[in-house]
Amino acid sequence: MHKPASPFGGAVAGTELGPLRITVSATANERYWASAGVDHPTLRQGALYPPVAANLAILLFQTVATRPLLHTAQRLISHRRGEAGTELTVTGTVVERYEKRGREYAVVDALVALPDGEPLWTSIATFCEQ
């Protein structure tokens, strides 16, 4: 008999995620700014586009939750400015799992850090499986 896979790759509250190391190139960063329709002086100064933190939280969670996900909620906290081309380290924890209307949900608290370990962004994301 076939047993269905555990939701979210078996990740439960307390599951540690990462580290995931990633560099957002200047070209990719510019695409993020442009897709939002934003032309801001900090872009021309090389600043990373802060909402990219949401994508990094998704990539981090997908290292364990490999089935299709719906990204249902997001909260971002920006701690400081980061520069495009800088290696970022993303770590996190599944802080909550719950069921609502017959669907399983997971809340992930992810920290995006600069090479010196200082926090750049905190991303709190909620997911459900499709």
Q: Can you describe what each PLM-predicted range is?
A:
Residues 1-8, 82-130:
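HotDog/MaoC-like acyl-thioester-processing domains
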Residues 50-94, 104, 124:
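Hydrophobic beta-strand-centered segment that forms part of the acyl-chain substrate-binding groove
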